[in-house]
Design a protein with these regions (language model features):
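Conserved G/P- and acidic residue-centered "switch" motifs that form tight phosphate/ATP-binding loops
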Residues: 56, 77, 183
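Structural core segment of the AMP-binding/adenylate-forming
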Residues: 47-48, 78-151
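Conserved AMP-binding/adenylate-forming core of the ANL superfamily
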Residues: 2, 18-63, 67-71, 88-93, ...
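Hydrophobic alpha-helical segments in the ANL/AMP-binding
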Residues: 9-11, 42, 46, 64-83, ...
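Conserved pre-ATP/AMP-binding loop-to-beta segment of ANL
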Residues: 2, 17-18, 134, 139-140, ...
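Conserved AMP-binding A3 loop
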Residues: 30-33, 175-184
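AMP-dependent adenylate-forming
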Residues: 7-30, 134-141
């Protein structure tokens, strides 16, 4: 029997909800917390119109939000497109366009790069990209395409949401679209 990534987390969260799932500089996350956050993010993204098969680009350094967003995509049946946050603007633009990502999840700034400004510049060149989700503290009220990660988690908590991945075929669908630098 083939099991989806979303189902693996959900099963483990049911069996061992208080057991450590992830240890990071930000602290400890349990299986129950990870599953709950992934479900909330999936519900919020689904509320924005993200569906099974849509591409979700992740431009994040190693952090808990990367893991939660990955599992949220799995719960949606979406395709994860992990991208190196160190990519220069032109390469990032190409990969986002080529992947046809409808959502990008990133940090507000990383290693001196202002991703909010970068995406403001990129939006006109990326017709498929509908939303940007940012991990950080800045108030983003000025653009209805940009959402704070924490706000989406809050808005998705407790939503009645039937996960696409629970419908049975998700384990056999494409889950990730991986780009390389071309070197080995």
């Amino acid at each position: 029997m083939t099991v989806s990534l979303a189902a693996v987390l959900a099963q483990r969260a049911t069996r061992d909800p208080e057991r450590a799932f992830l240890l990071s500089q930000q602290g400890r996350m349990t299986f129950g917390e990870a599953d709950s956050q992934a479900e909330a993010l999936a519900a919020a993204l689904h509320g924005l119109g993200v569906e099974a098969g849509d591409r979700i680009a992740l431009l994040l350094p190693p952090c808990p939000e990367f893991v939660v967003a990955t599992f949220a995509a799995a719960k949606l049946g979406a395709v994860v497109v992990p991208l190196n946050p160190r990519l220069p603007g032109p390469e990032l633009r190409y990969l986002l366009r080529h992947s046809e990502a409808v959502v990008a999840v990133t940090v507000e700034t990383f290693e001196g790069v202002d991703y909010l400004q970068l995406f403001e510049d990129l939006f006109p060149h990326l017709p498929e990209l509908q939303y940007l989700v940012t991990v950080g503290e800045e108030d983003l009220w000025y653009d209805d395409r940009i959402f704070q990660y924490e706000d989406l988690l809050s808005s998705g908590q407790g939503r009645d949401y039937a996960a696409a991945a629970a419908e049975g075929d998700a384990a056999d669908e494409v889950f990730g679209l991986l780009y390389t630098s071309g070197t080995t």
